[in-house]
Amino acid sequence: MQLNPSEISELIKSRIQGLEASADVRNQGTVISVTDGIVRIHGLSDVMQGEMLEFPGNTFGLALNLERDSVGAVILGEYEHISEGDIVKTTGRILEVPVGPELVGRVVDALGNPIDGKGPVNAKLTDAIEKIAPGVIWRKSVSQPVQTGLKSIDSMVPIGRGQRELIIGDRQCGKTAVAIDTIINQKGKDLICIYVAIGQKASSIMNVVRKLEETGALEYTIVVAASASESAAMQYLAPYAGCTMGEYFRDRGQDALIIYDDLTKQAWAYRQISLLLRRPPGREAYPGDVFYLHSRLLERAARVSEEYVEKFTNGEVKGKSGSLTALPVIETQAGDVTAFVPTNVISITDGQIFLETDLFNAGIRPAINAGVSVSRVGGAAQTKVVKKLSGGIRTDLAQYRELAAFAQFASDLDEATRKQLERGRRVTELLKQPQYQPLQVWELAVSLFSANNGYLDDLDVKDVLPFEKGLREYLKTSHADLIKRIEDTKDLSKDDESALHAALKDFKKSGAY
């Protein structure tokens, strides 16, 4: 058989042309050390900051330190099976979590994996956990309220949709209680809630979930849990994951509320990671970028304009503005608000609700210090009726606290001072509220109205709360039309004021409290 050289070359050419070879180019390196969930890797030349890395056993990590001859990464999850010499591959992806309405009513971890035993989440979309906050042009000023249902907050420290309001205080003084009451009060108000639990005991998180289930609040709530037993990496990532889940609703013209409970634990977790990565420590051993840790998170809470929503949804949603309201929680040590993390977060947020252990122990709950607590933008969002009635309350309380300090030393007080002290005692009593019992707008309005117009002045202090409760029941049965008008208009007309005066006089005459 004679072979023609031209035939051979044609045959080889056709074979080469028909060859389909696809090369999957992936950079890989070698683990050189593993310490407390922190891995040093040699040989990853083109890895990105924040890129996902693939380890053996379907384990992933996050590249945080890019050094000249090595990469420092943090493992997401278990790391006991990773050892020196293991191969690490780059993925070319950044960390994403599932987002969407499928997450509502579920309890998930910091990576969006369900941990409530109710099966898979089946979310259709995922989104990056680190995102740039909307620019100034796309934002709108805060103008709609978030009703917490707590008398002292809604009257003196109002919160608006798109605001960042800090809840700050020592341990065990009611910070989580304020946050949970706010979630419970959103029933039927078209507000999706996200509760991010960071570094808490698993039993405490379970109690919160159970209470939300009992009150029917879990139907519109997502719980993101990174308990104390989880790695520092998960506690560091949980707030960003929760924020991304909230942004899904904000960017589609809906309203969402996110609670970070608490950011002190996140700062501790980040400090631990940074020290293990051998980053230089600064004040209180925190790394230099701990301010940026919280600012880039809290700046993502905003009220965005109709144009932003329309642009984001490619014209599917028109004429609707969206909002993400943030209530970060910070735990102080012995009331020290001048520590590093508290001062950082106070400067980032639009106001703070300051809770005091002394007030809590004195039975004044919620233990809000009216003098130090402030809402810088919430006043514009306060409902008309509450704004009209709450001005006097704050002044009364502030003057009462001032006078009460002097009255300890003064033996004989003039009539005006004595009256002011008596009024202050009754207002303080009126603002007390049991946990898990948030009030509607009309109930708050009626309480403030009775205090402002002197209907509590001749009552014993111990009778103030029974009087308030009895008054609400009386109005429900005898003046349902008045309640409906206040609730619908969120205002108090002259006729309604006259009707309320008459109702209060009748109720007081009856003595049914």
Curated annotation (Swiss-Prot):
GO terms for molecular function: ADP binding; ATP binding; proton-transporting ATP synthase activity, rotational mechanism. SUPFAM superfamilies: C-terminal domain of alpha and beta subunits of F1 ATP synthase (SSF47917), N-terminal domain of alpha and beta subunits of F1 ATP synthase (SSF50615), P-loop containing nucleoside triphosphate hydrolases (SSF52540). It holds the Pfam family ATP-synt_ab_N. GO terms for cellular component: plasma membrane; proton-transporting ATP synthase complex. Its main location: membrane. Keywords: ATP synthesis, ATP-binding, Cell inner membrane, Cell membrane, CF(1), Hydrogen ion transport, Ion transport, Membrane, Nucleotide-binding, Translocase, Transport. The record marks S373 as: Required for activity. ATP binds at G169, D170, R171, Q172, C173, G174, K175, T176. The keyword Plastid does not apply. InterPro entries: ATP_synth_asu-like_sf, ATP_synth_asu_C, ATP_synth_asu_C_sf, ATP_synth_F1_a_nt-bd_dom, ATP_synth_F1_asu, ATPase_a/bsu_AS, ATPase_F1/V1/A1_a/bsu_N, ATPase_F1/V1/A1_a/bsu_N_sf. It is found in: Cell inner membrane. The keyword Ion transport applies. Its EC number is 7.1.2.2. It is a peripheral membrane protein. NCBIfam families: atpA, PRK13343.1. Produces ATP from ADP in the presence of a proton gradient across the membrane. The alpha chain is a regulatory subunit. Belongs to the ATPase alpha/beta chains family. F-type ATPases have 2 components, CF(1) - the catalytic core - and CF(0) - the membrane proton channel. CF(1) has five subunits: alpha(3), beta(3), gamma(1), delta(1), epsilon(1). CF(0) has three main subunits: a(1), b(2) and c(9-12). The alpha and beta chains form an alternating ring which encloses part of the gamma chain. CF(1) is attached to CF(0) by a central stalk formed by the gamma and epsilon chains, while a peripheral stalk is formed by the delta and b chains. PANTHER family: ATP SYNTHASE SUBUNIT ALPHA, MITOCHONDRIAL. This is ATP synthase subunit alpha 1. It comes from Burkholderia pseudomallei (strain K96243). The gene is atpA1.
